[in-house]
C-alpha cells in the first residue's frame, strides 16, 4: 500500500509544471461547481487573434463545446486558464503561442506564433468520479 502511494507521488511530482504565462484580461466569477483536473465541462467561447480577427465562435454555431480537463483534448492554454473557474463564470484569457498552436499555427485560421484571446463562459461542470484526497486523508492512509 505504501509503495503504491509513493509511486503515485513520484509520478505527480516528476512531471514539470509549465509556467502559466496566461494573462487573465477579464474574470467574472461563477457560483457553481469548480473546475478541477478531469472535470468534464461544457463551454461557450469566442476565439480571436491579437489583432481582433475572430477565428472561432461556439455562440454563432449555437453549439457549446464539451471536453474533459487534463486529457489533452484542448490546447494547454485552455487547460491552465480554465482550471479553478466555476460554473456560470466568464473569463477572457490571452494565451501565448507556446501554450496555443505554437510555431505551426492551425491551418489558414491561426498563423504560426499567434497570441490567442478567448472569451469563455462555463456552462456546466461535472466532477470526476473519484475523490480527491486531502493531506489529512493521506496521513491516515500512511498510518495504516
Per-segment meaning from a language model:
Residues 2-9, 14-144:
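Cross-family detector of peptidyl-prolyl cis-trans isomerase
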Amino acid at each position: 500500500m505504501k509503495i503504491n502511494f509513493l509511486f503515485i507521488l513520484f509520478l505527480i511530482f516528476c512531471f514539470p509544471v509549465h509556467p502559466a504565462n496566461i494573462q487573465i484580461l477579464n474574470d467574472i466569477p461563477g457560483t457553481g461547481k469548480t473546475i478541477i483536473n478531469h472535470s468534464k465541462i461544457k463551454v461557450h467561447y469566442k476565439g480571436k487573434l491579437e489583432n481582433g480577427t475572430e477565428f472561432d465562435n461556439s455562440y454563432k454555431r449555437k453549439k457549446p463545446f464539451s471536453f474533459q480537463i487534463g486529457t489533452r483534448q484542448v490546447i494547454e492554454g485552455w487547460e491552465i486558464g480554465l482550471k479553478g473557474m466555476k460554473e456560470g463564470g466568464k473569463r477572457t484569457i490571452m494565451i501565448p503561442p507556446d501554450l496555443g498552436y505554437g510555431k505551426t499555427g492551425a491551418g489558414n485560421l491561426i498563423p504560426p506564433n499567434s497570441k490567442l484571446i478567448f472569451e469563455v463562459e462555463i456552462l456546466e461542470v461535472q466532477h470526476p468520479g473519484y475523490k480527491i484526497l486531502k493531506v489529512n486523508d493521506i496521513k491516515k492512509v500512511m498510518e495504516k
